């Protein structure tokens, strides 16, 4: 399995984002609104309205941080970051098994990312589960950590048992277009790959 886990945000940056998001409770809506036909049947979470000021402002911050990070640039060869949104899952919420759409209105999705805005000790459950033909791995990230993986991987988020899981998700259109070539590139050594 090919993926990158990297510390993208520090504690101060996380707290600034969370403070902004907490200002606008009315802007959180049913996550099914942006899901594809299959994903909408298995998606049970909340997401921040992409047109809200809090979403626009903090999406720009995340976009800038990703594009300026050398480890991420070396791993993903990003042409464009798109579809950024903030989601949260509280008790009993989850996101069933699905594959991200390869083409979205905002761009091509070669790589998917999840950026954690909550330290893992503040919630139970809520593991990101990534599957390939040969393996399945579960991830619970620390606050500020980002995981990047091929959008073609089957993945899900297990039910949150306690607490609240707050993340930022989005997609990367890479300069490496072909799936086969992308996989070849992703197997090249990178200091942050695990």
What do these predicted ranges mean?
Residues 20, 35-105:
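Signature of the catalytic double-stranded beta-helix
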Residues 14-24, 29:
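A short, well-structured alpha-helix characteristic of acyl/acetyltransferase catalytic modules
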Residues 23, 30, 68-69, 178:
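Polar helix-capping/helix-linker motif
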Residues 3-9:
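Short amphipathic
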Residues 184-190:
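Conserved small/polar residues in nucleotide/adenosyl-binding loops
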Residues 7, 46-48, 139:
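Generic detection of short hydrophobic beta-strand segments and adjacent strand-loop junctions
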Residues 71-180:
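Catalytic core of non-heme Fe(II) oxygenases with the double-stranded beta-helix
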């Amino acid at each position: 399995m090919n993926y990158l886990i990297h510390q993208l945000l520090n504690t101060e940056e996380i707290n600034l984002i969370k403070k902004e998001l907490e200002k606008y409770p009315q802007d959180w809506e049913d996550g099914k609104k942006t899901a594809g036909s299959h994903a909408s049947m298995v998606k049970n979470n909340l997401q921040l309205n992409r047109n809200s000021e809090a979403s626009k402002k903090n999406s720009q911050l995340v976009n800038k941080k990703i594009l300026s990070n050398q480890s991420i640039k070396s791993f993903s060869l990003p042409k464009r970051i798109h579809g950024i949104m903030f989601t949260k899952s509280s008790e009993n919420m989850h996101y069933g098994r699905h594959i991200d759409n390869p083409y979205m209105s905002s761009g091509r999705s070669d790589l998917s990312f999840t950026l954690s805005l909550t330290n893992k000790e503040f919630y139970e459950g809520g593991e990101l589960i990534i599957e390939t033909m040969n393996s399945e791995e579960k991830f619970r990230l620390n606050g500020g950590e980002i995981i990047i993986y091929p959008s073609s991987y089957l993945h899900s988020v297990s039910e949150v048992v306690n607490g609240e899981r707050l993340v930022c998700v989005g997609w990367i259109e890479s300069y490496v277009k072909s799936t086969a070539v992308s996989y070849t590139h992703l197997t090249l050594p990178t200091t942050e790959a695990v």
